[in-house]
Amino acid sequence: MNKLITLIMSISGTWLLVSSIILLSINAATIEAAVASISKTNTSIKHLVVIFQENVSFDHYFATYPNATNPSGEPKFTSSPATPSVNGLSSHLLVNNPNGNYSVNPFRLDRSQAITCDMDHEYPAEQQAYHGGLLDKFIEFASSTDSGCTDAGHKKQVMGYFDGNTVTALWNYAQHFAMSDNSFATTFGPSTPGALNLISGQTHGATPANIADTVANGTVIADPDPRFDDCSSGTKIAMSGRNIGTILNSKDITWGWFQGGFKPTSKTADGRAVCGSIHKNINGTEEKDYVPHHEPFMYYSMTANPHHLPPTKVAMIGNTDQAHHQYDLSDFWNAAENGNLPAVSFLKAPKYQNGHAGYSDPIDEQHFLVSTINRIEQLPEWSDIAIIISYDDSDGWYDHMMPPIISQSNDPKYDKLLGSDLCGHVSRDAYQDRCGYGPRLPLLVISPYSKTTFVDHSITDQTSIIRFIEDNWGLGRLGNLSFDAKAGKIDNMMDFSDGAHASKLFLDPNTGMQTLASNG
């Protein structure tokens, strides 16, 4: 009997040893396949990092670029003489702005006014503010609806803008790398439509198909939470169709969405994740880090991680396991510092640092952007990285540029762009309630391959980012009337003709001013 037990243990031991060898071989093969997929690109970019921020119109941050006021006591900004022309606010618009009966000109907000109210940026309200191309109804329709908002004149605040003495880092990145002054939200509306457009070029396909003021004709027009997320509350929806994650998976290309506060702080009695991490913004107000409706992949069952499960190991970050490519922001750094940077990474700041008016601000946002970019520039992969800074919506902030309307809609309840309460007439190649393009948003590309001190005037939108991913890794289009098929290219912001062009730029997170620049 003892001999039999010994034999079984011996056999078991051998089996376990063989199993371990097989598993190690599988992991090695997975890593080798991931490396191979990263290396097969159609440009010099092998790693793409998309930093997706919140609620800023182009004029709100770049109205007077590259000319800053430079008052005493604020970080100084001096532009390069080589700075090209930018479509910002003209002297006429600054002093004689057409905005209906309110007669309020755009005005500068200083660093002491960094905490502002949240403007009205709902799908119908933004269209009404643009008033069929007259752009004269922002105060009437896009001003804050918060009765407690008294900052900078309450309704007038929507006309406010920051300059290079507050958003100093972004202005310095624009000086050193490439920016666009002609990039737009894919459609009008708030955060969730913007996030869905970023990953799928599509806001149609929601279930339920109609929820008052939230989903219309199967199209998302507001901010419901994702159904497949333990941390969601209130109105929840699911999305159908493909997104950029599903087609990256089909080609075995590593990727991930990394969001602040995604890691659970505890679990409920029935095992549901609790997202309870909190930070204070510069005003001392506590904000929960995780915002469910800012996490677009959680609307899709195929890419959701409902219980916020961690990756099984660092080596699996970017690959398919129980995390389903949805991670805490800390997992991005765990992967990067262990030589496992995914080919495509989407980074989402915690709530207090995402730039969203009402609970975040440009100074907290600058801390996140600069700390993140400084750190990425020190990675060994920097030589083949492109960082894209993009935004989900405008928050309703004034911008003087009328977007080209490439997708029309005629929902009489929610489409308000034209005097007839329409956004043109829906056609075969468009779903209802997808009026767009929407407001103009900032877009910057930071990379060794960025053109330097460059301003791109090509028309692009949020789906131009997924078009770059599709083209660079040979994925094909998403289909189902996704806007990726219509998107302009961001390639003009980069130059791959004769090697890297732009040197590293290290900034101070507090001031946004340059601390060190070096080649390589």
Describe each region flagged by the PLM:
Residues 11-25:
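Bacterial N-terminal signal peptides
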Residues 28-520:
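N-terminal pro-sequences and low-complexity stem/linker regions of secreted or lumenal proteins
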Residues 1-4:
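Positively charged n-region of N-terminal signal peptides that target proteins for export
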